[in-house]
């Protein structure tokens, strides 16, 4: 669960999520949404796709990020997804994943996409409601909703003083792919029907908006470059990365890419000096320190990993994923004092990352080691609820109630979890998202 890691299908990375948030926050504000209430998640999939699910969560495929030529293209796509959120557009899919964990949502989307494309009904398809499997409409917005989200996106981009040209370029790329293949194989096109009227509408807006020639900011251009370099280094074979960024390239991004590639081999004799050089030059960058902590932790050097992780958290105090990584390091150090610190950091992190099962799992471990068995059971109940496992959630909630003082905050939360878990479909008991 460190840095760029998670289930096979999705990537959690503090830096990339923060950078995308930086780019899209002006759009969220223009839409009248509270930025802290929104999440952006990366799906590890080379196909072009993005979608909204489970409330105010915007999902974006790594394939779309890597294909974006400009920040404006990425912002345009996310402005469109924000249009769906602001418009309260619900597909039947939205209803099905209302309370699902991030893994659960992605498993359903991939299952639905495979079924819609006729790629067998194995795996994820079993998680869909019966009529959803049969009907493509499960994931699909209506043409009216699509037009409405486009209209909203134009409004938000104008209000933020940004160009809609990126969205038009993105539509043109998709249209080209559709014409080439002659089918609707692209998952984005299946869930977001693209009509010539939609393209015309955006083109017309670009012709008339006074913001159409507003260039991308140098800061955003730099952010997208760094996102793509980091994503590429984490998802391509290390040999590919090292060939793309030979030692003679001493730019910051090339060294960052090489540090990641060496760590993934794993060759710490080369990875550590490379990342140490970047830390020396950029002492206030939390993510270089995070990578160093990750390298050390994953190679069994737990005690050495604590300091870089602590420094990363000090430099990015608002990043819950960094707190979860640091807490994991504290727990693995097998020091009771550190374990107490882990409990404090995790309680802080799960307030915003309540859909991230790993935080709850680590919290249960830390409470267990601290002999707070009632609180450990409560954390396991939260994990069960988040993962959509009705039986686990209810069993652990009852266990917590038996161990915690009656009417304490924990006792009352256990009661609520037991009640909330009733809403989970029984079918999902057999679904293991991890």
Segments the model singles out, each with a brief description of its role:
Residues 260, 294, 328-331, 365, ...:
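Residue-level recognition of tetratricopeptide repeat
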Residues 369, 378-380, 386-434:
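Terminal, low-structured helical/coil segments at or just beyond the last alpha-helical repeat
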Residues 7, 12-14, 18, 40, ...:
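Extracytoplasmic and endomembrane cell-envelope/extracellular-matrix remodeling and assembly machinery
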Residues 82-99, 117:
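Catalytic Zn2+-binding segment of zinc metalloproteases
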Residues 266, 300, 334-337, 371, ...:
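Residue-level detector of the short coil/turn that links helix A to helix B
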Residues 252, 286-287, 303, 320-321, ...:
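Helix-start (N-cap) detector for alpha-helical repeat units in TPR-like alpha-solenoids
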């Amino acid at each position: 669960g460190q840095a760029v890691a998670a289930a096979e299908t999705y990537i959690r990375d503090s830096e990339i999520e923060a950078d995308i948030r930086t780019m899209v926050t002006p759009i969220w504000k223009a839409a009248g949404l509270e930025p802290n209430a929104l999440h952006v998640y990366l799906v590890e999939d080379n196909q072009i796709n993005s979608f909204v699910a489970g409330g105010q969560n915007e999902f974006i495929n790594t394939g779309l990020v890597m294909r974006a030529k400009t920040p404006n293209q990425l912002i345009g796509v996310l402005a469109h997804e924000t249009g769906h959120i602001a418009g309260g557009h619900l597909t039947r899919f939205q209803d099905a994943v209302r309370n699902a964990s991030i893994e659960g949502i992605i498993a359903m989307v991939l299952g639905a996409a495979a079924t819609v494309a006729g790629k067998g009904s194995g795996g994820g398809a079993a998680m869909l409601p019966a009529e959803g499997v049969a009907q493509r409409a499960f994931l699909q917005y209506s043409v009216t909703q699509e037009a409405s989200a486009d209209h909203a996106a134009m409004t938000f981009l104008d209000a933020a003083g940004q160009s809609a040209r990126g969205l038009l370029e993105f539509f043109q790329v998709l249209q080209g792919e559709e014409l080439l293949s002659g089918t609707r194989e692209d998952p984005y096109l299946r869930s977001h029907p693209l009509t010539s009227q939609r393209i015309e509408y955006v083109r017309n807006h670009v012709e008339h908006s006074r913001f159409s020639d507003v260039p991308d900011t140098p800061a955003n251009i730099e952010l997208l470059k760094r996102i793509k370099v980091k994503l590429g280094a984490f998802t391509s074979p290390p040999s590919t990365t090292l060939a793309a960024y030979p030692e003679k390239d001493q730019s910051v991004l090339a060294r960052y890419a090489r540090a990641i590639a060496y760590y993934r081999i794993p060759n710490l004799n080369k990875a550590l000096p490379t990342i140490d050089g970047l830390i020396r030059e950029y002492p206030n960058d939390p993510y270089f320190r995070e990578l160093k902590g990750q390298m050390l932790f994953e190679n069994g050097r737990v005690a050495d990993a604590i300091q870089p992780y602590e420094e990363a958290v000090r430099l990015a105090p608002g990043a819950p994923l960094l707190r979860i990584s640091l807490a994991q390091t504290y727990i693995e150090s097998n020091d009771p004092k550190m374990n107490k610190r882990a409990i404090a950091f995790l309680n802080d992190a799960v307030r915003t990352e309540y859909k991230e099962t790993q935080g709850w799992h680590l919290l249960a471990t830390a409470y267990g080691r601290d002999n707070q068995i009632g609180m450990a059971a409560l954390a396991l109940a939260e994990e069960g609820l988040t993962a959509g496992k009705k039986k686990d959630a209810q069993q652990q909630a009852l266990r917590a109630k038996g161990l915690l003082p009656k009417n304490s905050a924990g006792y009352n939360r256990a009661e609520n979890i037991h009640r909330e878990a009733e809403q989970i479909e029984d079918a999902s008991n057999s679904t293991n998202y991890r």
